[in-house]
UniProtKB/Swiss-Prot annotation:
Keywords, comma-separated and alphabetical: DNA integration, DNA recombination, Endonuclease, Hydrolase, Magnesium, Metal-binding, Nuclease
Residues at which Mg(2+) binds: D190, D256
Organism this protein belongs to: Spiroplasma virus SpV1-C74
Descriptive protein name: Putative integrase ORF3
Assigned protein family: Belongs to the plectrovirus integrase ORF3 family.
Length: 362
């Protein structure tokens, strides 16, 4: 066997290893080295004394870590052949160039380079870090720059200019006005999953929710699965309920790119979207169907935020065992959400009161 020492040399190896351990008992990693050495010696003894398979012995003495066994067996055999067991001593893994060993001048030069770089090239931390590693900004900075991205980023964050940029971004965000639509009847639609791990239900349910972007009025309908037919059925109910309860005529519905809303046919050349039964149904009802950009849930932000409120506001103790019971619970929640809960975005009015105030203005 390649990794098992010859039976005739086993006792000689054992004696030399014991002598090596006795000389290095003060070593920081003595216990760890001793454990690996004795595991290898005991494995070799059992291999020659009994009818054991090597893989069974590795499981027994090296806890099924084959790579650890091969690593130590190779080190021990090489040390025995060269008669130099010093290589068995473990060395510290602490890096030689830790962050505080870099000079302040190098740190300042790299920070200066970043703030010039981000203004000229509109680049970020990552692009400059890799450009430094490639030597684009000179061999001197390449050799002196930190090898770790976290260290590089920490330098920049502690610079005063970084704080000014962050404060400027915060001011811009504060000045940014909230996105609002001017018309009633523009709805966002999405599916919410109700799973037993988060809600007191007996199985997984799906709820198609609708929210009016202008008034924040919301309704939803429970189903056992996601499908185009269920999505169309939910829209039928929404058209009827929004008209009969709130007097709202739906003119547009925005959805994500779920398979129940659109069909994507992908190949190596192009992506084409085929009009589905869902889109055709909305067209027949004179309702515009919009879809959000791919991987852009913020485009349907109001319905996404509405779904986050479920975990905070939709609470019940008794376990729900069917879709009808869940729908009844949700109807109570929708009544609270539409008629009782005030919204900061609506000047601390309920969605229904805000709808009435709009009708009075007209």
């Amino acid at each position: 066997m390649k990794y098992i020492i010859n039976n005739f040399n086993l006792f000689d190896l054992q004696a030399k290893l014991k002598n090596f351990l006795s000389k290095n008992y003060k070593n920081k990693y003595y216990k760890r080295i001793k454990q690996k050495i004795f595991s290898y010696i005991n494995l070799c003894n059992d291999y020659y004394n009994g009818n054991f398979l090597l893989k069974d012995l590795i499981k027994k003495y090296f806890k099924n870590k084959f790579s650890t066994f091969y690593y130590w067996a190779n080190k021990i055999l090489i040390a025995y052949k060269s008669n130099d067991f010093a290589e068995l001593l473990l060395k510290s893994t602490i890096p030689n160039n830790i962050n505080y060993q870099y000079s302040n001048d190098v740190r300042q030069n790299i920070c200066d380079l970043y703030f010039k770089y981000c203004n000229k090239h509109a680049g970020g931390v990552l692009s400059l870090f890799y450009n430094l590693k490639k030597g684009i900004h000179g061999e001197e900075l390449k050799n002196k720059a930190p090898k770790n991205l976290k260290t590089f980023f920490r330098w920049l964050k502690k610079d005063e200019r970084w704080l000014k940029i962050k404060n400027k971004i915060k001011e811009i965000k504060k000045q940014h006005s909230r996105y609002e639509v001017k018309e009633i009847g523009l709805l966002q639609m999405d599916a919410k999953y109700f799973v037993p791990s988060k809600f007191s239900v007996d199985k997984k349910y799906y709820v198609y929710d609708f929210i009016d972007e202008k008034t924040r009025l919301a309704l939803g309908y429970v189903y056992d699965k996601l499908s185009t037919d269920n999505a169309i059925d939910a829209v039928k109910k929404a058209i009827s309920d929004f008209k009969n309860i709130f007097g709202i005529i739906i003119t547009r519905i925005r959805t994500d790119n779920g398979s129940e809303f659109i069909n994507n046919y992908r190949n190596n050349q192009k992506i084409s979207v085929k009009k589905t039964n869902f889109t055709q149904f909305l067209t027949d009802k004179n309702i515009l169907h919009q879809t959000t950009p791919v991987r852009s849930p913020q485009s349907n932000g109001k319905i996404e935020r509405f779904h986050q409120n479920y975990t905070k506001l939709f609470v019940f103790e008794e376990k729900i065992l069917n879709a009808v019971s869940l729908q009844n619970k949700l109807n109570d929640y929708y009544y609270f959400y539409n008629f009782e809960r005030v919204h900061k975005s609506l000047n601390f009015q309920t969605p229904f009161n805000f709808l009435n105030s709009l009708s009075l203005i007209k």
